Amino acid sequence: MGYTIQLDKDGDYYWDEDPTHHDPYMRANATSHAAASHAAASHAAASHAAAPHTAVHHAFHEPFIKLNLTDKNIFNGLGFILIVIFIYLLIITLQQMLTRHIYNTVQQCVKTHLDSKNLQ
């Protein structure tokens, strides 16, 4: 499922999580058109005329920032497997380095200890 966030120059944003609609701006325009025509056709439109007008005004702004957030990220499919293998190899390498360091340190300590015993 894809998400689309659109931000216009006034800072108003539109959120769409319907995967069948490609562009939520088209849907926002259609919705506000329907609201405006319905309000104009209604006899009691005088009290409600302000709200559809602002909706039309805001819906027709060009998108200033268009951000598409889809579920295709690095944790999908092959990318996830490659990341897991890379982390696994990194952990093995670090573990071998640490083991070698500990072994060398212990060996040096034992050698120093034996040398000090031989000197006595």
Swiss-Prot record:
Belongs to the asfivirus B117L family. It is a single-pass membrane protein. This is Uncharacterized protein B117L. The chain crosses the membrane at residues 74-94. The lineage of its organism: Viruses, Varidnaviria, Bamfordvirae, Nucleocytoviricota, Pokkesviricetes. It comes from African swine fever virus (isolate Tick/Malawi/Lil 20-1/1983) (ASFV). Glycans are attached at residues 29, 68. It is found in: Host membrane; Virion. Keywords: Glycoprotein, Host membrane, Membrane, Transmembrane, Transmembrane helix, Virion. One of its GO terms (cellular component) is host cell membrane.
